């Protein structure tokens, strides 16, 4: 036994420790999709797995999204794993031509793909934008994206846009996607892209109008609300929407912290901001408030629901907004 141990120690001193085996798989953190009905180009950001860290971009093209992903898998230097996917970025050209539900359905067939990833749309070149996707110092890219998504949603400047949530909407609610852009400091998620009844991108809401949308969705509270003329700090909010055959009423209750504005002034300015956003939604044919979920209960069957032509009814609705404001105690 002692002789065997001595021989083992001699081997270690003479030959040293062997190198660790290289990574057998690469975790895809961001997927970018560009192209249209004739051709699709996909790009992924993966770690370099080098000692100094960093990320690299792999790309591939195909006739369809599925073909492009297969080409990417076969050409990758190691097996790709989708369990750490945090962000799916679609070019505006792609999102305006390919329905979002079709894109997400195709992606849901990818093995181990993380459908809790957020979905965004960009007007910028996806190849250039990919290089902007780098983590904050000392963090992983996946962690940086998680922190940004949470912070920006709490501020109300991006909508809830997880792929798994959007897939559940069906024909009862229109998906709203967040905006993606490059900045001098790197990468930013901001604003909301509206989709129509066919799931195609139609219009963009800037951050301040995205806040109003989230307020009407009941998702905005305890943050600064940027109204057209003033900014107020919300301390409490509640929202309800009532739908009849050809009218809809949005009721908003809010408490705010700003002593120099009267409740009447806050209510009037908030109501007008809501009406402006509702007009944008109607013009885009976007049911971001989920009125379809309410209307479907009046249908006797799915055939009756399809025959009701709810998208046309949505665009002809007459809206009333009632806002009740109270200063915080």
Regions found by a protein language model. Give the residues of each.
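Membrane-proximal alpha-helical signals and transmembrane carboxylates
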Residues: 7, 11-329
